[in-house]
Swiss-Prot record:
Gene Ontology MF terms: cysteine-type peptidase activity
CDD domains the UniProt entry points to: Peptidase_C1A (cd02248)
Protein family per UniProt: Belongs to the peptidase C1 family.
Cystine crosslinks: 127-170, 161-203, 261-310
Lineage: Eukaryota, Metazoa, Ecdysozoa, Arthropoda, Crustacea
Keyword Signal part of the UniProt annotation: yes
Alphabetized UniProt keyword annotations: Disulfide bond, Hydrolase, Protease, Signal, Thiol protease, Zymogen
Name recorded for this polypeptide: Digestive cysteine proteinase 3
Cleavable signal peptide: 1-16
Active site per UniProt: 130, 268, 288
EC identifiers of the protein: 3.4.22.-
Chain positions listed as propeptide in the UniProt record: 17-106
């Protein structure tokens, strides 16, 4: 990890600490030289202080969720945003079909994990391929509902093979473009046959290893009511969110609400796998792709019915099979 051209002010000269040593051991950190390690330790110490200060707000009832140290502890928020996102800005083309809310009865809470149609949490690593993980997650769910078979699908194939559809591998992409590619390609390979490598490679699709097919995609009407109906009646839904904030980088537990979140600046693709209410606070249950050590075992509860916080209902979609 290169030393960024950034200097942290107001920090004393870093000295060895048990928490820093534990962090390096836990996440296998090794740095190029002493200068870089000193810089990373200073970043870690600053994040450690920010986490402590934030959790005091939780204890005082000022916020509804907690944060905790995780694998991003030696990254500034700017570095984190440059590396860990991947939902592209700009036009994605016109949707081929739209799901609209019908104001019918819906379950009070949904968790598709309990129906065994959600694969374990995956890890995109330092590659902006969130869009691929969101897309495979939605297709894995639809494939299960139709075929009663849970198959983990290849994100690496989407990274390598869908560039003609506007996607840019680790440089970012769109879930709807991934669905279009899978449809036109005649399917997507299983993860076991085409494993994830967290880097752009040449396309190695094998028609003999297809795990699922896709017949098209549907864009959900951009309201939380429609998204709730889709999650309840259709299954896990691909969504894009604003995940640019320190609070998201280190989210740990509780119902996430970020007052500075944008409903239109969407930079991260994730998967809505349910919804519910916790201590009177409505939430969306969201599967992330940063491994199980992030958040609540790889998941986050995001505020629901709070003016589309973080844009979760701004661009939902799902594949058809």
């Amino acid at each position: 990890m290169k030393v960024a051209a950034l200097f942290l002010c107001g920090l004393a000269l870093a000295t060895a600490s048990p928490s820093w040593d534990h962090f390096k051991t836990q996440y296998g950190r090794k740095y190029g030289d002493a200068k870089e390690e000193l810089y990373r330790q200073r970043v870690f110490q600053q994040n450690e202080q920010l986490i402590e200060d934030f959790n005091k707000k939780f204890e005082n009832g000022e916020v509804t969720f907690k944060v905790a140290m995780n694998q991003f502890g030696d990254m500034t928020n700017e570095e984190f945003n440059a590396v860990m996102k991947g939902y592209k800005k700009g036009s994605r083309g016109e949707p081929k079909a739209v799901f609209t809310a019908e104001a019918g009865p819906m379950a009070a809470d949904v968790d598709w994990r309990t129906k065994a149609l959600v694969t374990p949490v995956k890890d995109q690593e330092q590659c902006g391929s969130c869009w691929a993980f969101s897309a495979t997650g939605a297709l894995e769910g639809q494939h299960f509902l139709k075929n009663d078979e849970l198959v983990s699908l290849s994100e690496q194939q989407l990274v390598d093979c869908s560039t003609d559809y506007g996607n840019d591998g680790c440089g970012g992409g769109w879930m709807t473009s991934a669905f279009d590619y899978i449809k036109d390609n005649g399917g997507i390979d299983t993860e076991s046959s085409y494993p994830y490598e967290a880097e752009d490679r040449s396309c190695r699709f094998d028609a003999n290893s297809i795990g699922a097919i896709c017949t098209g995609s549907v864009e959900v009407q951009h309201t939380e009511e429609a998204l709730q109906e889709a999650v309840s009646g259709v299954g896990p839904i691909s969504v894009a969110i604003d995940a640019s904030h320190f609070s998201f980088q280190f989210y740990s537990s509780g119902v996430y609400y970020e007052q500075n979140c944008s409903p239109t600046f969407l930079d991260h693709g994730v998967l809505a796998v349910g919804y519910g209410t916790e201590s009177t606070k409505d939430y969306w249950l969201v599967k992330n792709s940063w491994g199980s050590s992030w958040g609540d075992a790889g998941y986050i509860k995001m505020s629901r019915n709070r003016d589309n916080n973080c844009g979760i209902a701004s661009e939902p979609s799902y594949p058809t099979v």
